[in-house]
Amino acid sequence: MAEDNNQAAQGGNDAQNQLQFSMQRIYVKDISFESPNAPSVFQNAFKPKVGLDLNTTHKQVGENLYEVVVKVTAQVTNNEDGATAFLAEVEQAGLFRIAGLSDDQLDHTLGAFCPNMLFPYARECIDNLVNRGSFPPLMLSPVNFEGMYAQKKKRESEAAENAH
């Protein structure tokens, strides 16, 4: 009987150390759309030039609870006259419960895996904003967050080597 209780207690500890990953919530943290040259932008020939900026951040907000934010900024100018057609910005966020990972695994999960889950939502928000501004669809391509994460780690490693 005592042996069964010890095994149950040890099993409980194993359960606490097991990998836990769940998306708790997805939400828009910040959203903005500006069309500073409307309505004149609609009266000229429109040959868009798209500038895209993408950034990810993350922070711990509770025990085993992390907020990850994917910020997408799309600025479109008209090649004909250089006027800004629109500026759309979305901060798509998610709350993730994560436990049982090493520090390196956690950093990778927060820096690549979670942003990969959030990006389709950010892309949809940008597309909705552009559509409501009555501009042609802005089809954002998928993003290789794994590659971005690898580049970031490489830069950090090189910076650490150069600091020594």
From Swiss-Prot:
Keywords: Chaperone, Cytoplasm, Protein transport, Translocation, Transport
TM spans (from-to): none
Location of the protein in the cell: Cytoplasm
GO terms under biological process: protein folding; protein tetramerization; protein transport
Family matches, as InterPro entries: SecB (IPR003708), SecB-like_sf (IPR035958)
Main location: cytoplasm
Subunit structure: Homotetramer, a dimer of dimers. One homotetramer interacts with 1 SecA dimer.
Protein name, entry field: Protein-export protein SecB
Gene source species: Chromohalobacter salexigens (strain ATCC BAA-138 / DSM 3043 / CIP 106854 / NCIMB 13768 / 1H11)
Gene: secB
